[in-house]
């Protein structure tokens, strides 16, 4: 399986991600094996083992009545990730700090408040995937495999849970999409089941979640995802003003 980077991304970018993926795989986490970095024309890429299976997202779409079961499954898999330790990974706090510093849409007071809030939140050394959602989980014969470790860090696992929650809460469905209302309801039910299972099984205090979600939402603004700004700012301001 070849992951090609966009034009303009260099060999160093490919080797950086490959190094993360190799470290995560060596730690025994459910990630694809890395077979090296290659170049195709002017683009660099990473050669991964071939993954034969289907995305968890497809399973959710085929079996919407099993939304709670699928949410619990994702939570159990996330708990497995958070039991991993990879000391070579960068700190999640550093990644969030850089993103908040350049995020558009924040007032300077909000930016300062988010950075101060981040500084008060407890740290940790758990592996954090950084982009953990049903589209990055594949169901295979040897069990679930998690793709796309480019944003992997180490830190407080609740930061990673918050990232997943923000991705699900802030994503905007296209206007006029058939069944849009139903999809929104399924997504909310999925998120509820995922969070309930995670915090039932894990020791971290769920009261940290709102604070981490505000910080993660502020950082997400730096990615400039079309249509998400209003929801992300609501998450930030709802916590800072409470």
Question: In which residue ranges do the predicted regions lie?
Answer:
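ATP-binding pocket architecture of kinase catalytic cores
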Residues: 1-89, 122
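Acidic active-site catalytic centers that drive phospho-/nucleotidyl reactions
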Residues: 3, 17, 131, 148, ...
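Short histidine/acidic/glycine/proline-rich micro-motifs that form metal-
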Residues: 6-11, 98-101, 151-152
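Conserved protein kinase catalytic core
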Residues: 9-10, 55, 137, 154-156, ...
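Generic alpha-helical structural context detector
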Residues: 79, 163-166, 219
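An alpha-helical support segment within catalytic cores of ATP-dependent transferases
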Residues: 83-130, 138-141, 145
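Active-site Asp-x-Gly
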Residues: 143-188
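Helix-rich C-terminal or lid/interface subdomains of diverse kinases
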Residues: 168-169, 175-242
């Amino acid at each position: 399986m070849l992951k090609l980077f966009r034009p303009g991304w260099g060999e160093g970018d490919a080797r950086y991600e490959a190094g993360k993926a190799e470290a995560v795989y060596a730690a025994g986490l459910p990630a694809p094996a890395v077979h090296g970095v290659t170049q195709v024309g002017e683009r660099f890429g990473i050669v991964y083992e071939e993954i034969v299976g289907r995305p968890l997202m497809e399973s959710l779409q085929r079996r919407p009545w099993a939304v709670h079961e699928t949410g619990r499954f994702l939570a159990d898999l996330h708990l497995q990730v958070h039991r991993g330790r990879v000391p070579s990974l960068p700190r999640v706090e550093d990644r969030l700090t850089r993103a908040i510093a350049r995020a558009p849409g924040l007032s300077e007071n909000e930016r300062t408040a988010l950075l101060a809030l981040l500084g008060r939140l407890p740290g940790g050394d758990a592996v954090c995937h950084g982009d953990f959602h049903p589209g990055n989980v594949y169901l295979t014969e040897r069990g679930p495999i998690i793709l796309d470790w480019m944003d992997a860090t180490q830190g407080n696992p609740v930061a990673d849970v918050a990232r997943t929650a923000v991705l699900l809460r802030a994503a905007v469905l296209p206007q006029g999409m058939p069944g849009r209302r139903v999809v929104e309801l399924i997504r909310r039910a999925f998120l509820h089941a995922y969070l309930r299972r995670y915090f039932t099984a894990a020791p971290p205090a769920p009261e940290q979640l709102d604070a981490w979600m505000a910080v993660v939402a502020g950082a997400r603004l730096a990615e400039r995802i079309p249509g998400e700004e209003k929801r992300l700012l609501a998450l930030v301001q709802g916590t800072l003003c409470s």
